[in-house]
Every structure is written in C-alpha cells, then in structure tokens.
Amino acid sequence: MFDANCLKLMFVAGSQDFYHIKGGKNDRINALLDALELALQSKITAFQFRQKGDLALQDPIEIKQLALECQKLCQKYGAPFIVNDEVQLALELKADGVHVGQEDMAIEEVMALCKKRLFIGLSVNTLEQALKVRHLDGVAYFGVGPIFPTQSKKDKQVVGVELLKKIKDSGIKKPLIAIGGITAHNASKLREYGGIAVISAITQAKDKALAVGKLLKNA
C-alpha cells in the first residue's frame, strides 16, 4: 500500500554513489550498506535502490544480491524499499515500489507488468509530461527534477522550483517528490510542494545521522 508520507525524505543510492571511498567495488558496497543502515536509524522515510553510472555494478546477480541486502535493512526498520528503473528486479524481490523515468519503458507497460502489486513513481521533467499521465491511477507519485544543479544528473536540464509550482498550480493532485541538488540548506524552499529525495546530501555527509536530522527538520 502506498502512503504519501513515505515521500518526506527518500534516500536514493547505489554503490556507485560512494566513489569517494578508497578501495574497490566491495568497499563501495559496504559503504552503501553502512550508510543505509545509519540513514534508516535516523528515520529516512523511504529508500530507492539505484544502480546507474560509471561505477555501478554490471553483473545482474551482484545487483540482485545487493538489492536484497538493502531490502532486508529497509524491512528491519519498516521503511519502503523502491527499485529504480528495473521493473523486473522490483517484481522478483517483491519490492514495495518501482520508480521509472521518461526514457524507460512506457508507463502503461510498467503498470501492466506491476498489476498493482507495487506502487509506481514516475519522473517528470516538464508540466506537459505530468499533465499527460495525471489521470493514471496506477502512478502513485511524480518525481520532479533536477530542481537544483546536481552531479548525479549532469546531462539533465535544471527545472527549478518553478516546475513544482507549475505542476501544483495546474491542479494535479498526485503527490510530488523533488530531486536534484537538494541539501539541508535549500530543502525548506520545497516544503510546500511535497517530499524530497537526496543522494549526495547523505552519501557525502561526514556525519550521516546529523545530515538526515537536518534534512528531516527542513523537509
């Protein structure tokens, strides 16, 4: 079951987001699991598993194994576990949700595959994209961004807080979650529009518990 409260502070990450950690692949995997547990203890409201980028795992078996370990941690702390893009993996793991982008499978196809077994989040980068699927009950929420400049989506044009405002003003009732360059310093600007999703605000933080606390306070 989808509860919009889980969008308050979503941590999005994969092992590639720990590129600053010395060592190899296993060190990055361990760093992700450690950071996730700390973030869960500090009360993030959901976790999205995202393997993308130069240092992302490539072997499907390794990806599934890591996803499973992340899912177990989420279950331990009672937080929803969401898989980014990989619909088949999300179904195999019986994840709580799956998040897809505009470049992925057609949203109608995702809905047909999921058969309401897990909730679906959809990334939108324009008002038109949001309006086009506003009527689809199978889409639980919209991910909107990048709101601010970000390292993890260098190729994407920044849409700014303006897009959140446009979507809200258009009468769209679906819950929104903002992503892209969000920090404890700018999170409060987004509070009236919905939840926030962060990567580096947690992965790069020296004190992850403190970072989560500040984000929650401002979200």
UniProtKB/Swiss-Prot annotation:
One of its GO terms (cellular component) is cytoplasm. GO terms for biological process: thiamine biosynthetic process; thiamine diphosphate biosynthetic process. 4-amino-2-methyl-5-(diphosphooxymethyl)pyrimidine binds at Q48, F49, R50, Q51, K52, N84, S123, K153. It is an enzyme of class 2 (transferase). GO terms for molecular function: magnesium ion binding; thiamine-phosphate diphosphorylase activity. The keyword Aminoacyl-tRNA synthetase does not apply. Signal peptide: none annotated. Binds 1 Mg(2+) ion per subunit. It comes from the Bacteria. Its EC number is 2.5.1.3. InterPro entries: Aldolase_TIM, ThiamineP_synth_sf, ThiamineP_synth_TenI, TMP_synthase. 2-[(2R,5Z)-2-carboxy-4-methylthiazol-5(2H)-ylidene]ethyl phosphate binds at T150, Q151, S152, G181, I199, S200. It holds the Pfam family TMP-TENI. Pathway: Cofactor biosynthesis; thiamine diphosphate biosynthesis; thiamine phosphate from 4-amino-2-methyl-5-diphosphomethylpyrimidine and 4-methyl-5-(2-phosphoethyl)-thiazole: step 1/1. The keyword Ribosomal protein does not apply. It catalyses: 2-[(2R,5Z)-2-carboxy-4-methylthiazol-5(2H)-ylidene]ethyl phosphate + 4-amino-2-methyl-5-(diphosphooxymethyl)pyrimidine + 2 H(+) = thiamine phosphate + CO2 + diphosphate; 2-(2-carboxy-4-methylthiazol-5-yl)ethyl phosphate + 4-amino-2-methyl-5-(diphosphooxymethyl)pyrimidine + 2 H(+) = thiamine phosphate + CO2 + diphosphate; 4-methyl-5-(2-phosphooxyethyl)-thiazole + 4-amino-2-methyl-5-(diphosphooxymethyl)pyrimidine + H(+) = thiamine phosphate + diphosphate. Mg(2+) binds at D85, D104. Belongs to the thiamine-phosphate synthase family. Condenses 4-methyl-5-(beta-hydroxyethyl)thiazole monophosphate (THZ-P) and 2-methyl-4-amino-5-hydroxymethyl pyrimidine pyrophosphate (HMP-PP) to form thiamine monophosphate (TMP). HAMAP family: TMP_synthase. This is Thiamine-phosphate synthase. The gene is thiE.
